[in-house]
Regions:
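N-terminal periplasmic "start-of-domain" segments of outer-membrane beta-barrel proteins
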Residues: 43-79, 101-105, 133
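C-terminal beta-signal and adjacent terminal beta-strands/loops
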Residues: 73, 521, 563, 611, ...
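Extracytoplasmic beta-strand/coil segments of soluble accessory domains associated
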Residues: 82, 86-130
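Short acidic/polar hinge/loop motifs at secondary-structure boundaries
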Residues: 126-157, 176, 491, 533
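Short strand-turn segments of transmembrane beta-barrel domains in outer membranes
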Residues: 154-162, 171-204, 215, 223, ...
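Transmembrane beta-barrel wall of Gram-negative outer-membrane proteins
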Residues: 190-219, 224-263, 287-304, 348, ...
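Membrane-embedded beta-barrel scaffold of Gram-negative outer-membrane proteins
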Residues: 298-300, 308-326, 463-475, 493-549, ...
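Gram-negative outer-membrane beta-barrel transporters
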Residues: 354-355, 417-421, 430, 517-524, ...
Length: 699
């Protein structure tokens, strides 16, 4: 048996021991709860509370915090689950190189967050970002999510919230799944480029056990000359029950599988001289395949003393193979510069905690203490060379065991009717264990390293006066860096971020009418990750500073007319004065929604991404773009013996604008060009005007 196989066995044994330890703690907690229940004076029978829709305001700790309800999600174009993120002020998503089946590129608060390096994503309480990922640190692929199963999206920005840790520098996004459906759904849709989508959602039981089953399939060839052949299949099942009058338990399982072709990044010079069209390709063999299998459990018990014990656990199996070619024939003039990135892992962990509300010295208060545990057991992470998806060499191949243990404490106090304090602290302890699996590779990272960080948080909320609140926020946070770079000494294990913001939210007309918000924020980060074209990965750079302004408005403006709009300005640069590549200065989003009493809902949206520097010396810039989308949903006036029909239409890029998604500047070489290559802008073309319509049966 070789050294690598022994190491993999050892790290798996360690992983199993850690999991057993965590489960033991969870079981002890559950036994404690059961003992409390045994003395609970409340009657033992189970009471099932029906689902109730409410529009009550959630208290927030920052002017930039928000909740996106499902009614806004359903008005987004279908096909890319990440579309919902543009409802967040300043959040832009675009398709990245490598094809539609992989994670999008995310922009927020002056970050090109790549695939999630500085934005933390969650589905319920399970983290989505993947540490030490084969394609990029914090990789967050949202394509396993079925948008119609989402009840709402919680959004926070900045480093001010104790319950969020790794990757929460620019912000955090939590998708909350439904428990049950009021109506079952069967839906079919189709559009240009051979696009098809089919959806089935059912709630077979809605009483003692509330169940949800959903499945969707999606296929498109896209507008490219090299057909995408993108196929995605998702299935999800969830069951929720109340073991006692004060407790709730849910279990969720989901599976995702996708494969696709990609046209890669197009060099501007090849389009300008007619070598290829905007939707052509230099290397048509690019693409990928991926799969997720996820299991999650959640439990909470509400004590008679106004407290809550909560626990959850998750396990995910994940696999990705990605074939790309960024520089074409720069490094290998004969076979080409194709790159293969492979990632195969298990991720598991969970949360334990207790929340208690009450009075502290006569002051309304709430305290939450929790522990978050996570382990990424990566059996194989590989970067290699390939030609037409056939491996030609290996650059680095590793096995990684990366774990974190994160206790946190959160306190909420209201000492005065017009003042709230929300603060806390979290500690994060990481272990990085890397084993080399390739004795002949040019890169052979190996070793073990530990790192810890303490992150204080503080928020002051003043008001409300005349439906207006004022916010002051401060906190520190971090993103972790790739374990391979960490053990090799090339990067700080935990890149510290320090942020602050002040803001105001106001509903001058009250009720469901227009809400206005404005925020000024500031963020320092001591280690930046930037894109490297040669390998299609990221590298660690120096400290950066960002600051900016966000303004927004959302709500009812008159009768059936609603608006959701935002504008952001950001200044971002390295502390030595150089520009941060890809950081946008300006973003804007606006949606006018019309909810007609005849059963028709209409929405027109605009999304704007401003000019971005592509190089640190500011000599090459990516152009800005402005795209309009149209959505129509209409409840058909057809009487059915059971249920109702709804028709829908999405028109993306309504004005058929030529625009660019992911855009980079680096050196590449086409056939017959000089050996040193040519520095140029490379881009993924945005979709042209696209129509998609369908019919849904609700019953």
């Amino acid at each position: 048996m070789d050294v690598s196989s022994v190491h993999v066995k050892n790290v798996r044994d360690v992983s199993i021991r850690r999991l057993l330890l965590f489960l033991s703690v969870a079981i002890m907690g559950l036994r404690f709860v059961e003992s409390v229940q045994a003395h609970d004076p409340d009657p033992p029978e189970v009471i099932i509370v029906p689902e109730v829709t409410t529009s009550a305001e959630r208290p927030v700790a920052a002017s930039s915090q928000q909740f996106i309800p499902d009614k806004e999600i359903l008005l987004q174009p279908q096909g890319r689950p990440a579309q919902v993120l543009r409802l967040i002020p300043g959040f832009i998503t675009v398709e990245h190189s490598g094809g539609a089946g992989k994670a999008d590129q995310y922009f927020l608060r002056g970050f090109d967050a790549d695939h999630g390096t500085d934005v933390a994503f969650f589905i319920d309480n399970m983290p989505i970002n993947l540490r030490t990922h084969g394609h990029g640190q914090g990789y967050a692929d949202l394509n396993f999510i079925i948008p119609e199963t989402i009840q709402g999206v919680d959004v926070v920005k900045g480093t001010y919230h104790a319950e969020f840790g790794d990757f929460n520098t620019a912000g955090a996004v939590r998708f909350k799944t439904r428990e049950v459906l009021q109506e079952n759904v069967v839906q079919g849709a189709g559009g240009q480029f051979d696009t098809q989508r089919y959806l089935l959602m059912l709630s077979p039981t809605k009483d003692k056990v509330r169940t949800l089953f959903a499945a969707d399939g999606y296929y498109t060839n896209g507008p490219f000359e090299n057909d995408n052949r993108y196929f995605r299949f998702n299935v999800m099942g969830k069951a929720t029950m109340n073991p006692t009058v004060r407790s709730e338990f849910s279990v969720t399982g989901s599976y995702n599988k996708a494969n696709w072709n990609a046209s890669g990044e197009v060099p501007f010079r090849a389009v300008a001289d007619g070598t290829i069209s905007r939707f052509g390709s230099i290397d048509p063999s690019e693409g990928g395949k991926t799969q997720h299998a996820i299991g999650r459990m959640e439990y909470h018990y509400d004590t008679p003393s106004n407290g809550r014990f909560f626990a959850d656990a998750y396990l995910m199996y994940y696999k990705l193979d990605l074939w790309t070619n960024f520089t074409f024939f720069l490094n290998d003039p004969v076979r080409g510069d194709g790159v293969n990135q492979h990632d195969q892992r298990y991720m598991y962990g969970g949360n334990l905690g207790y929340e208690q509300a009450g009075q502290l010295f006569g002051i309304r208060s709430s305290a939450t203490a929790g522990l978050q545990v996570r382990n990424d057991s990566i059996a194989n992470i590989r970067l290699g060379t390939q030609t037409k998806r056939t491996a030609t060499g290996t650059i680095v191949e590793s096995a990684v065991e990366e774990a974190s243990y994160s206790p946190y404490l959160k306190l909420e106090l209201q000492p005065l009717p017009w003042m709230r304090l929300v603060g806390g602290v979290r500690a994060d302890y990481f272990t990085f264990d890397v084993q080399n699996l390739c004795e002949t590779c040019p890169q052979q990272p190996t070793g073990r390293k530990d790192s810890a960080q303490v992150s204080p948080k503080g928020n002051l909320i003043f008001g409300p006066w005349f439906n207006t609140e004022f916010f002051v926020n401060y906190g520190t946070g971090f993103h972790s860096n790739d374990a391979r770079s960490t053990v090799a000494g090339g990067s700080t294990p935990l890149a510290r971020a320090q942020g602050t913001e002040v803001g105001v939210r106001s509903k001058p007309w009250g009720g469901e009418r227009l809400e206005l918000l404005a925020t000024f924020w500031w963020l320092d980060l001591n280690s930046e990750l930037v894109f490297v074209g040669d390998a299609g990965t990221t590298e660690v750079r120096g400290p950066t500073r960002r600051y900016g302004v966000e303004v927004g408005a959302r709500g009812q403006i008159y009768g059936p007319f609603y608006v959701n709009g935002s504008f952001t300005w950001t200044h971002a640069q390295f502390k030595d004065g150089l520009a941060i590549p890809l950081a946008p200065d300006l973003t804007a989003y606006s949606a006018l929604i019309m909810r007609w009493p005849e059963g028709l809902s209409s929405q027109i949206q605009l999304t704007y991404l401003g000019v971005r520097n592509l190089t640190e010396d500011r000599t090459i810039k990516a152009p800005s773009w402005l795209v309009f989308d149209l959505t129509e949903r209409y409840q058909l006036p057809i009487k059915l013996s059971h249920g109702r029909f709804e028709a829908f239409l999405f028109v993306q890029n309504l004005l058929d604008t030529d625009w660019e998604g992911a855009t980079f500047a680096f050196t590449s070489r086409l056939p017959n060009e000089p050996a040193g290559g040519v520095q140029d802008i490379h881009f993924v073309p945005g979709n042209p005007r696209f129509f998609m319509g369908g019919l849904a049966w609700y019953f």
